[in-house]
């Protein structure tokens, strides 16, 4: 009879990976997993689109494993799970990569390279690493349809985006505004608030800060009695001081006037600042010093508070312009301008605090949203420049430097600019990070930039010399950085299009409460708080490669149209041609057919720049309309994927409207997407469809190195996923990542952990299968017989099947509740603790030799069922080895007629097979065994050495009954002759209690000493009560003090000849005295083990009979003679002889002697 169950000579999960992939590919298993579920309920999954212009990393394995787990699980549960891959192809990552490759900057586009050629380069670059992404996806076993992905640059995808924008436009949720926005000079575009709130965007930076002195024009009398009067205002961005036009105070805040000296110049001054911050800027030790005694250079600068005010008392006071390079101007609607006289005064602001600074805020309306708002409310002008085009611009240009004089309007320069003062600073970069001199070979030299003198330092030195700086110091503060360039952002006035997301904020919050967030805290915390503080969505991007904003406007802005489809644009172009604004319709010229939604038809056109920029439309009153030049936020692209991936509403309208493919039942991405993709999905769904976009979401944590550091090429701590999979296979990697910590926790990735998983879990499971296959093939077991009825199976079989069904129930619940870590750990514990280390170990003899009895059949059927079920339970997490194991089992038995485990049904638990009382009894056996084996290890007594007795104090009859039922099993496992039960209070074992001061200290405080003394004096009866009830009331001189079992450590004292262990309510004592009789039996057992090892290393078949010869030795001869028959029976020996000399024998070394054994086949 041939072998039916495959047996392996080695365990190679990397090869398993390759073999199973080949099988999947040849049998189109992924496609079948969907087609065979036609007509079944749908489980809707959305794939967040990665960008293929960057290599995939180990963190992508984590995110994709999580997605794959639940898609596979739901498929096995009978759902049809379609999963379409996608590519995020627009935006800054692509553009910056292309700029670097071409050696250009944004300013070169349209000059050194045409927009068409530049965008063609972007289109090519964005798919650069597609093959690597496809390879990793394939190798790691992530099933997603990469043959038909959605691609965000596709014209049909863009058309859906236009349709969505039109819906927002119709609802009045799309508007244009000139407001202060986060702006990235390095990227050359504005940023949305959700981009600015990506993890890592806000960083602690060490900058030069200044408390500037603003000289008063009309001081109150008491302010002018000592030196020159100043307002003090603190800033972390001294480069904005030349743009200052106001100071802001809190009307209800208390302020003080302080007579003192400038520490740098020694000049007498009177300064005004918040009373609460007085001690921040003045040394209290100097409060009693006389002003007249001060000498320039003294470390202690005297000060004297001479008056107090409310902020409201200061409003309206005027001061001199701090850095009078440029005069502020007022600009009328027709573009004419005049010098303004309304600036440089104190204004109110409710947002002013006394947490830091001086309680007076320096206002530069062109560089701060709050600044702009309070200035506008108070009629304060912004400090603008007028360029040669007549446009009003901040003092800093879009590249991050002060405007050059020759870029400005000549009349403006003549009337408003102090050329002598300003020319020294024209062209100065406000932050060294923007200066191209610090870009070396396309990389930012951050160290060099930080080492060089900054504009902040230069301005502070200038102010210091002019008696305008009260204090200059380095300060660490949190500052936003661009999510793609890693360089600081500015807050800058921009003409931008916005989505009025704040209008739907309440509804977004309401719908968010219906989403199942894993973890829940992300939904209520990070995401929920984000929604509570929502800002309008800055949609505009001043770039080239992206989805064009589909809005055309007249020059005066009186008419506009938002285009929702290519067909509408086609028809509007026809009107424009008729009006004479366009010579012909480019879409008609290229043969585009409106309403025909084929790929070939849409490939005839291109909806990107520069082609849409060339289209001029006509307004209803006959004026030309040009497209607003902006692109839209790339995050809108990805947030629209539920609709755009199916070209909604132009195609597939019914299946989305009927909610067949929407909303998603489940999505998953990294925690960095909480305010990215998760938000944009939710925002668009709420604003357009009044719906959630997803019902459940897992936001997985970061994958860090083993020391908790972020992985990066620079730190040389990044892990290559390809080499890792090649070495270990995907399964150990996936299992390690999922079971090491919950997906939403950060993972400290340690490559050694993969090897541990491979050995401990997969190795154990492989060995268990190998054991089964070996003996099943010997006995010809093929599972053709009817199942042995449960009632007729031995208790140990009924126990493991009960535990197995409990496992099915618990694992199914875990998967269903998106708790993969719990599921994996449950499976691992079952395989290691229950199946391998307990069931198989206890039942080996049932599989060895002998007749094919019902008992042996029950053992085979039970172990087979366990292996097949474990394979199915683990399949979502470790799809490769699960499939291999399942195939090896079912090919031999023919029990499941499916080509892959991933087409099989997920196991269903059978309640009638679960016996909790039996599980409790066996758990007791396992617990006692574990404790006794630990005691053996403590004194280095091997399990093969029999011992006389275990003594167990029992708390009650139920505990005693549980142990009695498994008494023989325990005795056999720990190799003792007897188990004795004693009354827990019989005094045989003495228990003690030790306080945990960290827990009890906070509870009892000053009473702790008395509590500790009372605990030390607790009687055995009191300790028993504490163990039984979990708490005990101590008597402290008539007062009651209740301690809990968790607050103390209960332990047992060893007694002579015995070792004692205690865990919870269970205590065991092991007699460790080895008598001569026990020693002989131990030697016999040890010889059995050594001879079995010789059989194995000699390559004998398990059925081969042997002859044994052992060299004589006074230490072992008695044992060999006494246990001759026992030894032979155990090792299939036909004879066992003692000899004075054994030639060609194997040397066996014992603790203090050695002997030789010869084993030959009979």
Swiss-Prot record:
It is found in: Cytoplasm. GO terms for biological process: isoleucyl-tRNA aminoacylation. InterPro entries: aa-tRNA-synth_Ia, Anticodon_Ile_ABEc, Ile-tRNA-ligase, Ile-tRNA-ligase_type2, M/V/L/I-tRNA-synth_anticd-bd, Rossmann-like_a/b/a_fold, tRNAsynth_Ia_anticodon-bd, Val/Leu/Ile-tRNA-synth_edit. A motif ('HIGH' region) lies at residues 50-60. It catalyses: tRNA(Ile) + L-isoleucine + ATP = L-isoleucyl-tRNA(Ile) + AMP + diphosphate. Its EC number is 6.1.1.5. It holds the Pfam family tRNA-synt_1. Keywords: Aminoacyl-tRNA synthetase, ATP-binding, Cytoplasm, Ligase, Metal-binding, Nucleotide-binding, Protein biosynthesis, Zinc. PANTHER family: ISOLEUCINE--TRNA LIGASE, CYTOPLASMIC, SOLEUCYL-TRNA SYNTHETASE. NCBIfam families: ileS. Belongs to the class-I aminoacyl-tRNA synthetase family. IleS type 2 subfamily. This is Isoleucine--tRNA ligase. It comes from Bacteroides thetaiotaomicron (strain ATCC 29148 / DSM 2079 / JCM 5827 / CCUG 10774 / NCTC 10582 / VPI-5482 / E50).
């Amino acid at each position: 009879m041939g072998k039916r169950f495959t047996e392996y000579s080695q365990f190679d999960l990397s090869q398993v990976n390759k073999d199973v992939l080949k099988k999947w590919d040849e049998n189109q298993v992924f496609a079948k997993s969907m087609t065979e579920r036609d007509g079944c309920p749908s489980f809707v999954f959305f794939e967040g689109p990665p960008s293929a212009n960057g290599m995939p990393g180990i963190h992508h394995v984590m995110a994709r494993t999580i997605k794959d787990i639940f898609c596979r699980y739901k498929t096995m549960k009978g759902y049809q799970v379609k999963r379409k891959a996608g590519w995020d192809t627009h935006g800054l990552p692509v553009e910056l990569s292309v700029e670097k490759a071409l050696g250009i900057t944004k300013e070169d586009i349209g000059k050194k390279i045409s927009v068409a050629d530049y965008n063609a380069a972007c289109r090519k670059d964005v798919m650069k690493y597609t093959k690597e992404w496809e390879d990793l996806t394939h190798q790691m076993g992530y099933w997603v349809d990469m043959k038909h992905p959605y691609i965000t640059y596709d014209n049909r995808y863009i058309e859906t985006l236009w349709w969505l924008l039109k819906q927002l436009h119709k609802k009045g949720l799309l508007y244009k505004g000139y407001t202060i926005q986060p702006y990235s000079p390095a990227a050359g575009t504005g940023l949305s608030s959700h981009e600015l709130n990506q993890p890592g965007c806000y960083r602690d930076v060490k900058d030069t800060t200044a408390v500037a002195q603003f000289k008063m024009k009309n001081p109150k009398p008491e302010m002018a009695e000592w030196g020159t009067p100043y307002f003090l205002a603190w800033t972390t961005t001294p480069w904005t001081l030349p743009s200052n036009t106001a100071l802001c105070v809190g009307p209800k805040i208390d302020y003080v006037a302080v007579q003192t000296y400038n520490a740098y110049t020694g000049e007498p001054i009177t300064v005004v600042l918040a009373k609460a911050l007085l001690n921040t800027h003045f040394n209290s030790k100097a409060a009693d010093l006389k002003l007249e005694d001060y000498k320039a250079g003294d470390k202690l600068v005297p000060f004297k508070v001479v008056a107090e005010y409310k902020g409201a008392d200061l409003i309206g006071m005027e001061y001199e312009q701090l850095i009078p390079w440029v005069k502020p101007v007022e600009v009328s609607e027709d573009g004419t301008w005049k010098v303004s006289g309304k600036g440089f005064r104190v204004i109110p602001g409710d947002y002013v605090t006394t947490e830091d600074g001086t309680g007076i805020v320096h206002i530069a309306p062109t560089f701060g949203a709050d600044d702009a708002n309070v200035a506008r409310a108070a009629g304060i002008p912004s400090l603008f420049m007028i360029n040669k085009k007549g446009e009003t611009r901040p003092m800093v240009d879009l590249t991050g430097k002060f405007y050059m004089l020759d870029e400005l309007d000549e009349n403006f320069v003549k009337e408003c600019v102090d050329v002598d003062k300003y020319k020294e600073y024209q062209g100065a970069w406000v932050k060294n990070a923007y200066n191209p001199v610090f870009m070396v070979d396309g990389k930012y030299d951050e160290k060099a930039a930080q080492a060089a003198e900054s504009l902040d330092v230069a301005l502070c030195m200038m102010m210091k010399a002019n008696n305008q700086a009260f204090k200059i110091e380095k300060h660490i503060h949190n500052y936003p950085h661009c999510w793609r360039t890693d360089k600081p952002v500015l807050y800058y006035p921009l003409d931008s299009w916005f989505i009025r997301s704040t209008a739907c904020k309440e509804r977004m919050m309401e719908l968010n409460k219906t989403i199942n967030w894993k973890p829940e805290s992300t939904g209520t915390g990070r995401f929920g708080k984000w929604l509570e503080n929502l800002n309008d969505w800055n949609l505009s991007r001043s770039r080239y490669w992206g989805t064009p904003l589909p809005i055309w406007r007249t020059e005066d802005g009186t008419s506009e149209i938002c285009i929702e489809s290519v067909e509408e644009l086609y028809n509007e172009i026809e009107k424009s041609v008729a009006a004479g604004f366009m010579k012909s319709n480019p879409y008609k010229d290229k043969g585009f057919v409106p309403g025909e939604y084929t790929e070939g038809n849409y490939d005839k056109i291109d909806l990107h720049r520069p082609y849409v920029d060339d289209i001029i439309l006509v307004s209803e009153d006959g004026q030309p309309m040009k497209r607003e030049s902006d692109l839209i936020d790339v995050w809108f692209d990805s947030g629209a994927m539920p609709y755009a991936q199916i070209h909604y509403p132009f195609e597939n309208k019914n299946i989305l409207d009927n909610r067949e493919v929407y909303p998603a039942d489940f999505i998953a991405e990294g925690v960095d997407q909480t305010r990215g993709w998760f938000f944009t999905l939710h925002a668009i769904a709420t604003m357009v469809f009044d719906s959630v976009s997803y019902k459940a979401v897992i936001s997985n944590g970061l994958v860090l190195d083993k020391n908790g550091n972020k992985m990066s090429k620079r730190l040389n701590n990044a892990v290559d996923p390809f080499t890792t999979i090649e070495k270990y296979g995907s399964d150990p990697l996936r299992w390690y990542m999922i079971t090491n910590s919950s997906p939403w926790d950060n993972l400290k990735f340690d490559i050694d952990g993969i090897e541990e998983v491979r050995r401990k879990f997969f190795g154990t499971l492989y060995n268990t299968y190998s054991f089964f296959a070996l003996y099943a093939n010997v006995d010809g077991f093929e599972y053709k017989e009817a199942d042995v009825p449960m009632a007729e199976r031995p208790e140990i079989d009924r126990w493991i099947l009960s535990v197995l069904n409990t496992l099915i129930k618990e694992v199914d619940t875990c998967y269903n509740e998106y708790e993969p870590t719990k599921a994996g750990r449950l499976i691992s514990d079952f395989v290691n603790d229950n199946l391998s280390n307990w069931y198989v170990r206890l039942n080996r003899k049932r599989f060895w030799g002998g007749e094919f009895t019902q008992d042996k059949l029950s053992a085979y059927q039970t172990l087979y069922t366990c292996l097949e079920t474990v394979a199915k339970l683990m399949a979502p997490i470790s799809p490769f080895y699960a499939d291999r194991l399942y195939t090896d089992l079912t090919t031999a038995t023919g029990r499941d007629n499916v080509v892959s485990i991933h087409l099989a049904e997920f196991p269903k638990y059978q309640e009638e097979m679960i016996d909790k009382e039996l599980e409790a009894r066996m758990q007791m056996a396992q617990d006692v065994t574990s404790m006794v084996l630990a005691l053996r290890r403590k004194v280095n007594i091997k399990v093969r050495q029999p011992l006389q007795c275990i003594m167990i104090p029992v708390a009650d009859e139920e505990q005693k009954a549980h142990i009695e039922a498994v008494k023989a099993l325990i005795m056999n496992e720990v190799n003792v002759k007897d188990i004795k039960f004693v009354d827990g209070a019989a005094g045989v074992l003495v228990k003690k209690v030790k306080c945990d001061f960290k827990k009890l200290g906070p509870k009892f405080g000053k009473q702790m000493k008395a509590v500790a003394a009372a605990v030390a004096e607790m009687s055995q009866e009191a300790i028993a009560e504490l163990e039984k009830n979990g708490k005990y009331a101590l008597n402290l001189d008539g007062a009651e003090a209740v301690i809990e079992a968790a607050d103390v450590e209960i332990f047992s004292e060893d007694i002579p000849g015995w070792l004692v262990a205690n865990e919870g309510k269970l205590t065991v004592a092991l007699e460790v005295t080895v008598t001569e009789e026990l020693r002989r039996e131990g030697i016999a057992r040890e010889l059995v083990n050594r001879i079995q090892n010789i059989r194995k290393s000699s390559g004998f078949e398990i059925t081969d009979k042997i002859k044994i010869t052992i060299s004589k030795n006074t230490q072992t001869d008695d044992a060999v003679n006494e246990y001759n028959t026992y030894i032979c029976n155990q090792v299939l020996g036909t004879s066992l002889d003692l000899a004075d000399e054994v030639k060609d024998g194997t040397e066996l070394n014992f603790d203090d002697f050695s002997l030789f054994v010869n084993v030959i086949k009979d």
